Amino acid sequence: MSAVITPADFNDYKVADISLAAWGRRETIIAESEMPALMGLRRKYASEQPLKGAKILGCIHMTIQTAVLIETLVALGAEVRWSSCNIFSTQDQAAASIAAAGIPVFAWKGETEEEYEWCLEQTILKDGQPWDANMILDDGGDLTELLHKKYPQVLDRVHGVTEETTTGVHRLLDMLAKGELKIPAINVNDSVTKSKNDNKYGCRHSLNDAIKRGTDHLLSGKQALVIGYGDVGKGSAQSLRQEGMIVKVSEVDPICAMQACMDGFELVSPFIDGINDGTEASIDKALLGKIDLIVTTTGNVNVCDANMLKALKKRAVVCNIGHFDNEIDTAFMRKNWAWEEVKPQVHKIHRTGAGSFDPQNDDYLILLAEGRLVNLGNATGHPSRIMDGSFANQVLAQIFLFGQKYADLSPAQKAERLTVEVLPKKLDEEVALEMVRGFGGVVTQLTKQQADYIGVTVEGPFKPHAYRY
Protein backbone atom coordinates (compact mmCIF):
# COMPACT_ATOMS: atom_id res chain seq x y z
CA MET A 1 0.00 0.00 0.00
CA SER A 2 1.32 3.42 -0.85
CA ALA A 3 -1.62 5.81 -0.68
CA VAL A 4 -1.35 8.57 1.89
CA ILE A 5 -4.51 10.54 2.56
CA THR A 6 -4.84 13.90 4.24
CA PRO A 7 -6.01 14.07 7.86
CA ALA A 8 -9.16 15.89 6.75
CA ASP A 9 -10.32 12.76 4.93
CA PHE A 10 -10.17 10.59 8.04
CA ASN A 11 -10.17 11.19 11.79
CA ASP A 12 -10.76 7.77 13.36
CA TYR A 13 -7.30 7.62 14.91
CA LYS A 14 -5.03 9.11 17.56
CA VAL A 15 -1.28 9.17 17.00
CA ALA A 16 1.56 11.38 18.20
CA ASP A 17 2.10 13.27 14.94
CA ILE A 18 0.37 12.54 11.63
CA SER A 19 3.08 14.49 9.79
CA LEU A 20 5.43 11.55 10.43
CA ALA A 21 3.44 9.44 7.95
CA ALA A 22 5.78 9.89 4.98
CA TRP A 23 8.75 8.81 7.09
CA GLY A 24 6.81 5.79 8.28
CA ARG A 25 5.85 4.92 4.70
CA ARG A 26 9.49 4.99 3.58
CA GLU A 27 10.50 2.67 6.41
CA THR A 28 7.56 0.36 5.73
CA ILE A 29 8.62 -0.06 2.11
CA ILE A 30 12.10 -1.08 3.26
CA ALA A 31 10.61 -3.49 5.81
CA GLU A 32 8.53 -5.13 3.08
CA SER A 33 11.74 -6.05 1.28
CA GLU A 34 12.91 -7.83 4.45
CA MET A 35 9.67 -9.75 5.06
CA PRO A 36 9.52 -12.34 2.25
CA ALA A 37 7.08 -14.71 3.97
CA LEU A 38 4.53 -12.00 4.67
CA MET A 39 4.81 -10.52 1.19
CA GLY A 40 4.63 -14.02 -0.28
CA LEU A 41 1.31 -14.56 1.50
CA ARG A 42 0.04 -11.28 0.04
CA ARG A 43 0.82 -12.50 -3.45
CA LYS A 44 -0.42 -16.04 -2.88
CA TYR A 45 -3.81 -15.07 -1.48
CA ALA A 46 -4.40 -11.75 -3.28
CA SER A 47 -7.01 -13.09 -5.69
CA GLU A 48 -8.63 -15.44 -3.18
CA GLN A 49 -9.20 -12.69 -0.56
CA PRO A 50 -9.55 -15.19 2.32
CA LEU A 51 -10.15 -12.43 4.89
CA LYS A 52 -12.94 -10.68 2.99
CA GLY A 53 -15.55 -9.91 5.62
CA ALA A 54 -13.11 -10.23 8.52
CA LYS A 55 -13.24 -7.37 11.00
CA ILE A 56 -10.17 -7.65 13.19
CA LEU A 57 -9.48 -5.98 16.53
CA GLY A 58 -5.68 -5.84 16.79
CA CYS A 59 -3.48 -5.11 19.79
CA ILE A 60 0.21 -5.64 19.16
CA HIS A 61 3.31 -3.42 19.23
CA MET A 62 2.69 -0.64 16.68
CA THR A 63 6.03 -0.86 14.89
CA ILE A 64 7.09 -0.60 11.27
CA GLN A 65 6.93 -4.38 11.00
CA THR A 66 3.39 -4.34 12.39
CA ALA A 67 2.48 -1.83 9.69
CA VAL A 68 3.43 -4.49 7.13
CA LEU A 69 1.28 -7.02 9.01
CA ILE A 70 -1.71 -4.66 9.14
CA GLU A 71 -1.49 -3.84 5.46
CA THR A 72 -1.19 -7.54 4.61
CA LEU A 73 -4.40 -8.27 6.52
CA VAL A 74 -6.10 -5.40 4.69
CA ALA A 75 -4.71 -6.55 1.33
CA LEU A 76 -6.29 -9.96 1.93
CA GLY A 77 -9.71 -8.42 2.52
CA ALA A 78 -9.87 -7.56 6.21
CA GLU A 79 -10.91 -4.39 8.00
CA VAL A 80 -8.97 -3.65 11.19
CA ARG A 81 -8.86 -1.39 14.21
CA TRP A 82 -5.54 -1.24 16.05
CA SER A 83 -3.72 -0.30 19.24
CA SER A 84 -0.35 -1.14 20.80
CA CYS A 85 0.04 -3.69 23.60
CA ASN A 86 2.80 -1.70 25.33
CA ILE A 87 2.98 1.94 26.37
CA PHE A 88 6.55 2.37 25.12
CA SER A 89 6.74 0.15 22.03
CA THR A 90 5.03 2.28 19.38
CA GLN A 91 7.13 3.78 16.62
CA ASP A 92 5.26 7.02 16.03
CA GLN A 93 6.12 7.15 12.34
CA ALA A 94 4.62 3.67 11.89
CA ALA A 95 1.39 4.63 13.63
CA ALA A 96 1.19 7.81 11.55
CA SER A 97 1.64 5.94 8.28
CA ILE A 98 -1.18 3.53 9.18
CA ALA A 99 -3.50 6.38 10.15
CA ALA A 100 -2.63 8.23 6.94
CA ALA A 101 -3.62 5.14 4.97
CA GLY A 102 -7.13 5.38 6.44
CA ILE A 103 -6.78 2.59 9.00
CA PRO A 104 -8.04 3.25 12.55
CA VAL A 105 -5.11 3.19 14.97
CA PHE A 106 -4.71 4.45 18.52
CA ALA A 107 -1.09 4.35 19.65
CA TRP A 108 1.86 6.56 20.50
CA LYS A 109 5.15 6.07 22.30
CA GLY A 110 5.03 7.02 25.97
CA GLU A 111 1.36 6.48 26.76
CA THR A 112 0.28 6.67 30.39
CA GLU A 113 -1.53 3.67 31.86
CA GLU A 114 -4.80 5.59 31.53
CA GLU A 115 -4.08 6.46 27.90
CA TYR A 116 -3.22 2.82 27.21
CA GLU A 117 -6.60 1.72 28.56
CA TRP A 118 -8.28 4.42 26.47
CA CYS A 119 -6.53 3.19 23.33
CA LEU A 120 -7.73 -0.36 24.01
CA GLU A 121 -11.27 0.95 24.33
CA GLN A 122 -11.03 2.89 21.06
CA THR A 123 -9.88 -0.27 19.32
CA ILE A 124 -13.18 -1.87 20.32
CA LEU A 125 -15.43 1.17 19.86
CA LYS A 126 -16.39 2.91 16.63
CA ASP A 127 -18.35 6.14 17.03
CA GLY A 128 -18.73 5.31 20.70
CA GLN A 129 -20.32 1.90 20.16
CA PRO A 130 -18.75 -1.57 19.99
CA TRP A 131 -17.65 -2.28 16.43
CA ASP A 132 -19.12 -5.39 14.82
CA ALA A 133 -15.77 -7.18 14.98
CA ASN A 134 -15.51 -10.89 14.29
CA MET A 135 -11.79 -11.60 14.89
CA ILE A 136 -9.15 -10.67 17.48
CA LEU A 137 -5.36 -10.47 17.10
CA ASP A 138 -3.69 -10.00 20.48
CA ASP A 139 -0.28 -9.77 22.14
CA GLY A 140 -0.27 -10.39 25.88
CA GLY A 141 -4.00 -10.82 26.36
CA ASP A 142 -5.08 -7.37 27.54
CA LEU A 143 -7.52 -6.84 24.66
CA THR A 144 -8.94 -10.34 25.01
CA GLU A 145 -9.45 -9.86 28.73
CA LEU A 146 -11.11 -6.46 28.28
CA LEU A 147 -13.56 -7.92 25.77
CA HIS A 148 -14.45 -10.81 28.08
CA LYS A 149 -14.94 -8.57 31.11
CA LYS A 150 -16.49 -5.39 29.68
CA TYR A 151 -17.78 -6.18 26.18
CA PRO A 152 -18.85 -9.85 26.26
CA GLN A 153 -21.61 -9.14 23.74
CA VAL A 154 -18.95 -8.51 21.08
CA LEU A 155 -17.71 -12.07 21.51
CA ASP A 156 -21.01 -13.46 20.25
CA ARG A 157 -19.86 -12.53 16.71
CA VAL A 158 -16.17 -13.40 17.12
CA HIS A 159 -14.74 -16.50 15.46
CA GLY A 160 -11.55 -16.55 17.52
CA VAL A 161 -8.35 -14.90 18.73
CA THR A 162 -4.77 -15.38 17.60
CA GLU A 163 -2.29 -14.78 20.44
CA GLU A 164 1.32 -13.74 19.88
CA THR A 165 3.10 -14.27 23.20
CA THR A 166 3.90 -16.72 25.96
CA THR A 167 2.22 -14.47 28.52
CA GLY A 168 -0.96 -14.18 26.48
CA VAL A 169 -1.09 -17.94 25.90
CA HIS A 170 -0.76 -18.55 29.65
CA ARG A 171 -3.73 -16.23 30.23
CA LEU A 172 -5.80 -17.99 27.57
CA LEU A 173 -5.07 -21.43 29.01
CA ASP A 174 -5.97 -20.18 32.48
CA MET A 175 -9.27 -18.78 31.18
CA LEU A 176 -9.98 -22.06 29.38
CA ALA A 177 -9.29 -24.10 32.53
CA LYS A 178 -11.62 -21.88 34.56
CA GLY A 179 -14.39 -22.05 31.95
CA GLU A 180 -14.10 -18.31 31.23
CA LEU A 181 -12.86 -18.41 27.62
CA LYS A 182 -15.72 -17.72 25.19
CA ILE A 183 -13.92 -18.14 21.85
CA PRO A 184 -11.32 -20.50 20.38
CA ALA A 185 -7.70 -19.40 20.19
CA ILE A 186 -4.67 -20.10 18.07
CA ASN A 187 -1.42 -20.14 20.04
CA VAL A 188 0.85 -18.40 17.54
CA ASN A 189 3.65 -18.22 20.10
CA ASP A 190 4.40 -21.92 19.94
CA SER A 191 4.64 -22.16 16.18
CA VAL A 192 8.26 -23.08 15.50
CA THR A 193 8.65 -20.20 13.05
CA LYS A 194 7.54 -17.84 15.81
CA SER A 195 9.19 -19.21 18.94
CA LYS A 196 12.56 -19.96 17.39
CA ASN A 197 12.67 -16.79 15.30
CA ASP A 198 11.05 -14.13 17.43
CA ASN A 199 11.74 -15.44 20.93
CA LYS A 200 15.25 -16.79 20.36
CA TYR A 201 16.90 -15.22 17.33
CA GLY A 202 15.06 -11.92 17.71
CA CYS A 203 16.19 -11.45 21.31
CA ARG A 204 19.71 -12.45 20.30
CA HIS A 205 19.71 -9.42 18.01
CA SER A 206 17.70 -6.83 19.93
CA LEU A 207 18.65 -7.18 23.62
CA ASN A 208 22.24 -5.97 23.41
CA ASP A 209 21.14 -3.28 20.94
CA ALA A 210 18.63 -1.89 23.44
CA ILE A 211 21.02 -1.96 26.40
CA LYS A 212 23.74 -0.16 24.46
CA ARG A 213 21.31 2.46 23.14
CA GLY A 214 19.93 3.03 26.63
CA THR A 215 23.21 3.19 28.54
CA ASP A 216 26.09 3.70 26.09
CA HIS A 217 27.91 1.14 28.25
CA LEU A 218 30.61 -1.23 27.08
CA LEU A 219 29.35 -4.69 28.02
CA SER A 220 32.53 -6.71 27.48
CA GLY A 221 34.06 -8.26 30.58
CA LYS A 222 31.10 -7.43 32.80
CA GLN A 223 28.90 -9.94 34.60
CA ALA A 224 25.29 -10.54 33.58
CA LEU A 225 22.53 -12.62 35.14
CA VAL A 226 19.78 -13.82 32.80
CA ILE A 227 16.64 -14.90 34.68
CA GLY A 228 15.04 -17.72 32.69
CA TYR A 229 16.33 -19.96 29.90
CA GLY A 230 13.34 -20.57 27.69
CA ASP A 231 13.58 -19.43 24.08
CA VAL A 232 13.71 -15.75 25.11
CA GLY A 233 16.32 -16.50 27.75
CA LYS A 234 18.39 -18.54 25.30
CA GLY A 235 18.45 -15.70 22.78
CA SER A 236 19.17 -13.15 25.50
CA ALA A 237 22.10 -15.11 26.92
CA GLN A 238 23.56 -15.46 23.42
CA SER A 239 23.05 -11.73 22.83
CA LEU A 240 25.10 -10.84 25.90
CA ARG A 241 27.74 -13.48 25.23
CA GLN A 242 28.21 -11.93 21.76
CA GLU A 243 29.14 -8.70 23.54
CA GLY A 244 31.83 -10.46 25.58
CA MET A 245 29.89 -10.50 28.83
CA ILE A 246 30.37 -13.18 31.50
CA VAL A 247 26.84 -14.62 31.48
CA LYS A 248 25.20 -16.56 34.29
CA VAL A 249 21.72 -18.06 34.09
CA SER A 250 19.02 -18.68 36.69
CA GLU A 251 16.27 -21.20 35.89
CA VAL A 252 13.51 -23.16 37.67
CA ASP A 253 12.90 -25.84 35.03
CA PRO A 254 15.49 -28.66 35.22
CA ILE A 255 15.33 -29.25 31.46
CA CYS A 256 16.01 -25.62 30.59
CA ALA A 257 18.64 -25.54 33.35
CA MET A 258 20.38 -28.52 31.76
CA GLN A 259 20.32 -26.76 28.39
CA ALA A 260 21.96 -23.69 29.93
CA CYS A 261 24.75 -25.87 31.32
CA MET A 262 25.19 -27.67 28.01
CA ASP A 263 25.38 -24.31 26.23
CA GLY A 264 28.27 -23.33 28.48
CA PHE A 265 26.54 -20.93 30.87
CA GLU A 266 27.05 -21.09 34.63
CA LEU A 267 23.77 -22.02 36.29
CA VAL A 268 23.27 -20.07 39.50
CA SER A 269 20.46 -18.96 41.77
CA PRO A 270 20.02 -15.54 43.35
CA PHE A 271 18.84 -17.45 46.43
CA ILE A 272 20.96 -19.54 48.78
CA ASP A 273 20.47 -23.20 47.80
CA GLY A 274 17.86 -21.97 45.31
CA ILE A 275 15.22 -21.35 47.99
CA ASN A 276 13.41 -18.00 48.17
CA ASP A 277 11.76 -17.75 51.59
CA GLY A 278 10.83 -14.10 51.08
CA THR A 279 13.52 -12.73 53.39
CA GLU A 280 16.76 -10.90 52.70
CA ALA A 281 18.56 -13.72 54.50
CA SER A 282 17.78 -16.08 51.61
CA ILE A 283 19.52 -13.86 49.05
CA ASP A 284 22.94 -14.83 47.69
CA LYS A 285 24.44 -11.40 48.25
CA ALA A 286 27.90 -12.53 47.21
CA LEU A 287 26.53 -13.40 43.76
CA LEU A 288 24.29 -10.39 43.21
CA GLY A 289 26.91 -8.01 44.58
CA LYS A 290 29.04 -8.77 41.50
CA ILE A 291 26.29 -8.53 38.85
CA ASP A 292 26.55 -5.58 36.44
CA LEU A 293 23.40 -6.41 34.46
CA ILE A 294 20.27 -8.39 35.25
CA VAL A 295 17.75 -9.33 32.56
CA THR A 296 14.37 -10.99 33.18
CA THR A 297 13.02 -13.18 30.37
CA THR A 298 10.29 -15.32 31.92
CA GLY A 299 6.77 -13.92 31.56
CA ASN A 300 6.39 -14.63 35.29
CA VAL A 301 5.91 -12.29 38.24
CA ASN A 302 8.56 -10.85 40.62
CA VAL A 303 11.40 -12.99 39.28
CA CYS A 304 13.60 -10.04 40.19
CA ASP A 305 12.08 -9.17 43.55
CA ALA A 306 12.68 -6.43 46.09
CA ASN A 307 15.28 -8.37 48.05
CA MET A 308 17.25 -9.08 44.90
CA LEU A 309 17.10 -5.42 43.90
CA LYS A 310 18.46 -4.42 47.31
CA ALA A 311 21.41 -6.80 46.95
CA LEU A 312 22.47 -5.88 43.42
CA LYS A 313 25.80 -4.19 42.82
CA LYS A 314 25.77 -0.40 42.86
CA ARG A 315 24.98 1.07 39.45
CA ALA A 316 23.86 -2.27 38.02
CA VAL A 317 21.59 -2.16 34.97
CA VAL A 318 18.15 -3.78 35.37
CA CYS A 319 15.87 -4.62 32.46
CA ASN A 320 13.14 -6.97 31.24
CA ILE A 321 12.59 -8.64 27.88
CA GLY A 322 9.84 -11.03 29.04
CA HIS A 323 6.53 -9.19 28.85
CA PHE A 324 4.88 -7.13 31.62
CA ASP A 325 6.74 -4.84 34.02
CA ASN A 326 5.83 -7.05 37.00
CA GLU A 327 8.72 -9.42 36.27
CA ILE A 328 10.78 -6.83 38.15
CA ASP A 329 9.31 -5.51 41.40
CA THR A 330 8.95 -1.99 40.05
CA ALA A 331 6.08 -1.38 42.49
CA PHE A 332 8.56 -1.69 45.38
CA MET A 333 10.99 0.58 43.59
CA ARG A 334 8.35 3.27 43.09
CA LYS A 335 7.22 3.12 46.71
CA ASN A 336 10.60 3.02 48.41
CA TRP A 337 13.25 4.58 46.17
CA ALA A 338 13.66 7.88 44.35
CA TRP A 339 13.50 7.89 40.54
CA GLU A 340 15.65 10.24 38.47
CA GLU A 341 14.94 10.35 34.74
CA VAL A 342 18.16 10.44 32.75
CA LYS A 343 16.34 10.41 29.41
CA PRO A 344 13.13 8.79 28.15
CA GLN A 345 12.96 5.15 29.31
CA VAL A 346 16.20 5.41 31.32
CA HIS A 347 16.01 6.04 35.08
CA LYS A 348 18.47 6.10 37.94
CA ILE A 349 16.75 4.42 40.89
CA HIS A 350 18.38 5.83 44.03
CA ARG A 351 18.37 3.26 46.82
CA THR A 352 18.72 5.96 49.48
CA GLY A 353 15.00 6.46 50.17
CA ALA A 354 11.81 7.60 48.52
CA GLY A 355 12.29 11.31 49.00
CA SER A 356 14.87 13.61 47.50
CA PHE A 357 18.22 12.31 46.33
CA ASP A 358 21.75 13.56 45.95
CA PRO A 359 22.64 13.66 42.23
CA GLN A 360 26.17 12.61 43.22
CA ASN A 361 24.89 9.51 45.05
CA ASP A 362 26.43 6.34 43.63
CA ASP A 363 24.06 3.81 45.25
CA TYR A 364 21.60 3.52 42.43
CA LEU A 365 20.36 1.08 39.81
CA ILE A 366 19.82 1.94 36.14
CA LEU A 367 16.34 0.78 35.15
CA LEU A 368 15.52 0.59 31.45
CA ALA A 369 12.02 1.09 29.97
CA GLU A 370 10.54 1.26 33.50
CA GLY A 371 10.74 -2.53 33.60
CA ARG A 372 8.76 -3.02 30.40
CA LEU A 373 10.12 -4.58 27.22
CA VAL A 374 13.60 -3.15 26.88
CA ASN A 375 14.08 -4.00 23.22
CA LEU A 376 11.00 -2.00 22.24
CA GLY A 377 11.32 0.71 24.90
CA ASN A 378 14.98 1.54 24.35
CA ALA A 379 15.33 0.38 20.74
CA THR A 380 13.10 -0.65 17.84
CA GLY A 381 12.60 -4.32 18.65
CA HIS A 382 13.40 -7.28 16.45
CA PRO A 383 14.50 -6.90 12.82
CA SER A 384 11.95 -7.16 10.04
CA ARG A 385 13.35 -10.51 8.88
CA ILE A 386 12.69 -11.95 12.35
CA MET A 387 9.16 -10.57 12.65
CA ASP A 388 8.41 -11.91 9.18
CA GLY A 389 7.97 -15.41 10.60
CA SER A 390 5.84 -14.31 13.55
CA PHE A 391 3.52 -12.17 11.47
CA ALA A 392 3.19 -14.67 8.64
CA ASN A 393 1.96 -17.06 11.33
CA GLN A 394 -0.53 -14.44 12.49
CA VAL A 395 -1.91 -14.04 8.97
CA LEU A 396 -2.28 -17.78 8.47
CA ALA A 397 -3.86 -18.14 11.91
CA GLN A 398 -6.36 -15.39 11.13
CA ILE A 399 -7.23 -17.06 7.81
CA PHE A 400 -7.57 -20.45 9.53
CA LEU A 401 -9.84 -19.26 12.37
CA PHE A 402 -11.91 -16.97 10.15
CA GLY A 403 -12.55 -19.92 7.86
CA GLN A 404 -13.76 -22.06 10.78
CA LYS A 405 -16.66 -19.61 11.40
CA TYR A 406 -16.94 -20.49 15.09
CA ALA A 407 -19.59 -17.85 15.81
CA ASP A 408 -21.93 -19.50 13.28
CA LEU A 409 -21.76 -22.98 14.84
CA SER A 410 -24.35 -24.72 16.99
CA PRO A 411 -23.80 -24.74 20.79
CA ALA A 412 -22.70 -28.37 20.65
CA GLN A 413 -20.18 -27.66 17.89
CA LYS A 414 -18.90 -24.62 19.77
CA ALA A 415 -18.31 -26.67 22.90
CA GLU A 416 -16.23 -29.12 20.88
CA ARG A 417 -14.10 -26.44 19.21
CA LEU A 418 -13.49 -24.20 22.21
CA THR A 419 -9.76 -24.86 22.43
CA VAL A 420 -6.35 -23.20 22.51
CA GLU A 421 -4.29 -24.84 19.75
CA VAL A 422 -1.18 -24.28 17.67
CA LEU A 423 -1.31 -23.92 13.90
CA PRO A 424 -1.09 -27.14 11.89
CA LYS A 425 2.54 -28.07 11.23
CA LYS A 426 2.00 -27.84 7.46
CA LEU A 427 1.31 -24.11 7.81
CA ASP A 428 4.39 -23.70 10.03
CA GLU A 429 6.44 -25.32 7.27
CA GLU A 430 4.84 -23.02 4.70
CA VAL A 431 6.08 -19.98 6.63
CA ALA A 432 9.54 -21.50 7.03
CA LEU A 433 9.82 -22.25 3.31
CA GLU A 434 8.96 -18.67 2.37
CA MET A 435 11.58 -17.42 4.83
CA VAL A 436 14.21 -19.78 3.40
CA ARG A 437 13.43 -18.56 -0.10
CA GLY A 438 13.89 -15.02 1.15
CA PHE A 439 17.44 -15.93 2.14
CA GLY A 440 18.03 -17.43 -1.30
CA GLY A 441 18.23 -20.90 0.23
CA VAL A 442 17.37 -24.11 -1.61
CA VAL A 443 15.51 -26.89 0.23
CA THR A 444 16.26 -30.45 -0.87
CA GLN A 445 13.20 -32.52 -1.78
CA LEU A 446 12.80 -36.06 -0.49
CA THR A 447 12.59 -38.84 -3.04
CA LYS A 448 9.48 -41.02 -2.91
CA GLN A 449 11.59 -43.85 -1.52
CA GLN A 450 12.99 -41.63 1.24
CA ALA A 451 9.56 -40.27 2.14
CA ASP A 452 8.09 -43.76 2.35
CA TYR A 453 11.00 -44.93 4.48
CA ILE A 454 10.35 -42.34 7.21
CA GLY A 455 6.57 -42.42 6.83
CA VAL A 456 5.86 -38.94 5.45
CA THR A 457 4.74 -37.50 2.14
CA VAL A 458 7.16 -35.81 -0.22
CA GLU A 459 5.36 -32.50 0.43
CA GLY A 460 5.40 -32.84 4.26
CA PRO A 461 4.72 -32.33 7.09
CA PHE A 462 8.15 -33.75 7.80
CA LYS A 463 8.13 -34.18 11.58
CA PRO A 464 5.62 -35.64 14.07
CA HIS A 465 3.66 -33.22 16.22
CA ALA A 466 5.74 -34.01 19.30
CA TYR A 467 9.08 -33.28 17.60
CA ARG A 468 11.19 -30.72 19.45
CA TYR A 469 13.12 -28.49 17.07
Curated annotation (Swiss-Prot):
Record field: transmembrane: none
Compartment(s) of residence: Cytoplasm
GO molecular-function terms, A-Z: adenosylhomocysteinase activity
Protein residues bound to NAD(+): 165-167, 199, 228-233, 251, 300, 321-323, 375
Keyword set includes Hydrolase: yes
GO CC field: cytosol
SUPFAM superfamilies per UniProt: Formate/glycerate dehydrogenase catalytic domain-like, NAD(P)-binding Rossmann-fold domains
InterPro entries, A to Z: Adenosylhomocyst_ase-like_sf, Adenosylhomocysteinase-like, Ado_hCys_hydrolase_NAD-bd, NAD(P)-bd_dom_sf, S-Ado-L-homoCys_hydrolase_CS
Function of the protein: May play a key role in the regulation of the intracellular concentration of adenosylhomocysteine.
UniProt: substrate binding residues: T63, D139, E164, K194, D198
Domain of life: Bacteria
Catalytic activity entry: S-adenosyl-L-homocysteine + H2O = L-homocysteine + adenosine
Pathway linked to the protein: Amino-acid biosynthesis; L-homocysteine biosynthesis; L-homocysteine from S-adenosyl-L-homocysteine: step 1/1
CDD domains recorded: SAHH
Gene Ontology process terms (BP): L-homocysteine biosynthetic process; one-carbon metabolic process; S-adenosylmethionine cycle
Main location class: cytoplasm
Gene designation per UniProt: ahcY
Protein name: Adenosylhomocysteinase
UniProtKB keywords: Cytoplasm, Hydrolase, NAD, One-carbon metabolism
Paired cysteines (S-S): none
Family label: Belongs to the adenosylhomocysteinase family.
Listed cofactors: NAD(+)
